[in-house]
Design a protein with these regions (language model features):
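Low-complexity, intrinsically disordered terminal/linker segments enriched in charged
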Residues: 32-54, 74-79, 92, 164-174, ...
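Contiguous beta-strand segments within globular domains
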Residues: 63-88
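Conserved small/polar residues in nucleotide/adenosyl-binding loops
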Residues: 411-418
Length: 421
């Protein structure tokens, strides 16, 4: 995904140069309206490894090149059997098919289609036994295709045959660790995994690492509640170590007992030795999802909450309107009347899930006019709407009077080609 975002960033410059100008930004016919976004329809696919779900995958609307996805790696034992869990949400899954390719995508080693998916609670379960002769310690690309009423959704992971990698132990440890951090009584047992350089009370929640104090690791006095469960995603794994990323959402009550929402991302590097897991590295970033309905105003500006210091923002010449980006959402702020408007967001106001809240996209502000209109570029993975599941670049114009953001141009991205709408 980082490769795609980097490619999108490079193509963004080319795209802007090719489409820049007032005629495009202001006079083109509208092709989309952010208020008309349909709900996400693509299911999620995960791997069930000894009753622990790992490697959550999101659907793409078109086949991607085999070497494009480095989001996850799924280890295989000698049986070469895998169990997949599909969360269909409201979609009907007609069939599950998969394809194994060499890592560069040049050769198809195996492809099969499975129509009998087993219903298990909220999930559909699929058992796969890979029949191809896979070399030990060599990565292969696996493409999964779900046939839906809305079309076909594609999912990607890498598979590798390695012995004694303890993948399920690593995944279970990550799940235990992050859940224990949310429980003060359980968190006391985490001290042996840390290398604290401070022992004071928690004063920061955005840049936590293995050298942070136990109080900081366990969220200090924030008392958060789990809102969206995390699924461990294995990034790298071998016979001695593993790197795992976990993303989840928390809520917390502020001093006025109002609910705040946080996007959390954690990185774990671990070693399995002598029947136990050692934590080699731990990093956590927590970013608050901005909510304009909360008391965010101060005499000299607005409070963005817990986040990093690098803010994408732009103001008009008179400094009467300021546009800023936070957690994949675009906002406008008028200091004169202390008015905040949400300009663009994939997030649903209620009944949302990870499909609409994931931030594998970014926003670049191009211009803020004297009237408060905003031109901006959205690029990356499209969470929902008519372009759900595509990597793309869209130029938007926000009309402040109408409080509507409309897309005036859109381009799909592929690994080595583009297609214009």
């Amino acid at each position: 995904m980082k490769r795609i975002l980097k490619k999108a960033g490079i193509l963004l410059l080319v795209f802007l140069l090719g489409t820049a100008g007032t005629a495009l930004l202001l006079n083109s016919e509208s092709t989309d309206n952010r208020s008309d976004f349909n709900d996400a329809v693509f299911p999620e696919v995960m791997v069930d490894m000894n009753d622990t779900l790992i490697n959550r995958m999101y659907g793409y609307a078109q086949p991607m090149q085999a070497d494009f996805s480095r989001d996850s790696v799924t280890p295989l034992d000698t049986s070469k059997k895998l169990t997949f869990k599909v969360n269909p949400y409201d979609s009907e899954v007609k069939s599950f098919s998969y394809e194994i390719r060499t890592s560069d995508g040049s050769k198809v080693l195996e492809n099969k289609k499975i129509k009998n998916l087993v219903k298990e609670d909220q999930y559909l379960s699929v058992d796969v036994e890979i029949g191809s002769d896979l070399r030990m310690n060599q990565e292969y690309s696996m493409q999964i295709a779900l046939e839906l009423d809305e079309g076909t959704a594609y999912y990607y992971t890498r598979v590798v045959s390695r012995s004694q990698v303890h993948a399920s132990d690593y995944a279970a440890f990550v799940k235990y660790f992050y859940e224990a951090c949310l429980n003060k009584e359980s968190a006391d047992a985490l001290g042996s995994y840390l290398e604290p350089q401070t022992t004071g009370a928690a004063t920061n929640y955005s840049g936590i690492n293995i050298n942070s104090s136990l109080s900081e690791i366990s969220w200090g006095n924030l008392a958060p509640q789990l809102c969206q469960e995390g699924i461990p995603v294995i990034k790298e794994i071998n016979e001695t170590t593993a790197s795992v990323v976990l993303e989840y959402q928390l809520t917390s009550q502020n001093d006025d007992e109002e609910t705040e929402l946080y996007d959390v991302k954690e990185f774990y590097r671990m070693k399995y030795q002598d029947t136990r897991i050692y934590l080699l590295d731990f990093q956590r970033s927590a970013n608050q999802v901005f909510d304009g309905t909360l008391p965010v105003y101060e005499d000299d500006g607005i409070i963005l909450g817990v986040r990093d210091k690098n803010v994408e923002y732009m103001m008009n010449d008179a400094a009467t309107v300021i546009a800023f980006v936070q957690e994949g959402d675009l906002w406008s702020y008028s200091p004169g009347n202390e008015k905040v408007n949400q300009v663009f967001s994939f997030r649903k106001l209620k009944d949302g899930d990870f499909r609409d809240s994931r931030t594998q996209h970014d926003i670049k502000i191009v211009r803020v006019t004297d009237e408060g209109d905003i031109d901006f570029v959205l690029y990356g993975y499209m969470n929902r709407g008519s372009h759900e599941g595509y990597e793309g670049i869209a130029v938007y114009h926000y009309n402040r009077d109408k409080n509507v953001a409309e897309a005036v141009s859109y381009t799909h991205l592929r690994a080595h080609e583009t297609r214009h709408d």
